[in-house]
Amino acid sequence: MTEITQKHYLNIKERFGEVMTAVENLGKTVKDAGPVKAKEAELIQLGAALAIRSEGGVHSHVRRALDAGATKEELYHTLILLTSTIGFPAVMAGISWIDDILK
């Protein structure tokens, strides 16, 4: 997340703590419910974040994917695979959002 997104997330978490705890627990539960490994789960969520044009979501899942062992090549390829699905302009925006984090 960018600094602004991180501040916003923390503000929402402070204001709506019970709801955010439930959302975080749901995320953990669904990740633990099947055979998809952490790195692949983050790459899937990275693609989904880009599909809904969520810059903050892309930033977050780039960080999480890196923490789970993804390479920068895997990050970029995950988005490039979406070119025929969500379009070239969206993928180019996503690549710039990955670049924000890798700088």
Identify the function of each model-found stretch.
Residues 51-79:
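Mid-chain, well-packed structural core segment of small domains
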